[in-house]
Amino acid sequence: MFRLLVLMGFTFFFYHLHASGNLTKYINMKYAYLSFIAIFLLAILTAVQAYLFIKSPEKSGHHHDHDCGCGHDHEHDHEQNKPFYQRYLIYVVFLFPLVSGIFFPIATLDSSIVKTKGFSFKAMESGDHYSQTQYLRPDASLYYAQDSYDKQMKQLFNKYSSKKEISLTDDDFLKGMETIYNYPGEFLGRTIEFHGFAYKGNAINKNQLFVLRFGIIHCIADSGVYGMLVEFPKDMDIKDDEWIHIKGTLASEYYQPFKSTLPVVKVTDWNTIKKPDDPYVYRGF
C-alpha cells in the first residue's frame, strides 16, 4: 500500500510541476521532455503496483492456512516480522522530498544566496571554471568543444556588434552578457538596457550597484548569477532584491573589490519594476 501511495505521489508531483508552471524553477525547459518521460514511467509503475495491490492475497481473501513444509511465504512472513521502523524507513527517504515538494512553498534564488556563497570575480581571474559558481560573466565554453564554442561566439558577436542599441530580454540575456564580457572593448559607447534585481555587494560608491539575474544552464544545481555593475549619476537608495530596469552607455573601469576591469553601465534612465513570474533566465544551445 505504501509503495502505491509513494508512486501516486511522485506521479502527481511531476504533473503538478508542469500544470503550475513551476518546472522552470528547477530545470531549463529545454529538458522538459525528461520530466514528461518520468511522468509516463511513473504512471505505468503506479498502475502495475495498483494491480498487484488489488490482486494480493490479503485483498482477494485467499489465505493459505496449511503448511506444506516447502518454505511457502517464509520470505513474506520474515518481512512482516521485521520491526515497524525497519520496514518503513525506506519509505521515509522517498516521502520527505515528496512532502516538501508538494506542500512547502518554492523559494526562488535571490541576493541572500549571493551573500551566502560569497560574491567575487575569482572565476575570471583564475580561469578555473570548474571549481566554483559562475558570477557576472556567463561561460558556456564548458559545454562545447572549443571550435564549436568559438564559432558560436563569432556568430553572437556579429549579431550584437551590428546593433547601436542592445536590448537584452529573458531569451537572450545570457548570450548577450557572455558576448559583451568576451569582447568588452568592442561595445564601449553602445547603449544597453536590461532588467534584474539589485545587489550592492562590495560596491564602494553609493551610486554603484550590480543588476543581476540568476541563470540556469541545465538545472538549478548549476545556476549562476550574471549581470553587470551599473553606475547612476547620483547616489541612490535602492535596496537589495529590488527589481529595476536600467538603460545606459557601456563603459569599463577597474573595480577595486574584485581587482578586475569590469564592463559598467553608465545609467541614463531607470525605473523599478515588478518581480517577474519567472525570475530566472536560461541558456539556449
Curated annotation (Swiss-Prot):
Q: What is its main location?
A: membrane
Q: Does the keyword Transmembrane apply?
A: yes
Q: Which residues cross the membrane?
A: 4-24, 34-54, 89-109, 210-230
Annotated compartments: Cell membrane
Q: Which UniProt keywords apply?
A: Cell membrane, Membrane, Transmembrane, Transmembrane helix
Keyword Transmembrane listed: yes
Bilayer topology reads: Multi-pass membrane protein
InterPro entries according to UniProt: DUF1980 (IPR015402), DUF1980_C (IPR048447), DUF1980_N (IPR048493), UPF0703_membrane_permease (IPR052955)
Record-level GO cellular component terms: plasma membrane
Q: Which family does it belong to?
A: Belongs to the UPF0703 family.
Family matches, as PANTHER family: UPF0703 PROTEIN YCGQ
Please give the name of this protein.
UPF0703 protein YcgQ
Q: Which organism is it from?
A: Bacillus subtilis (strain 168)
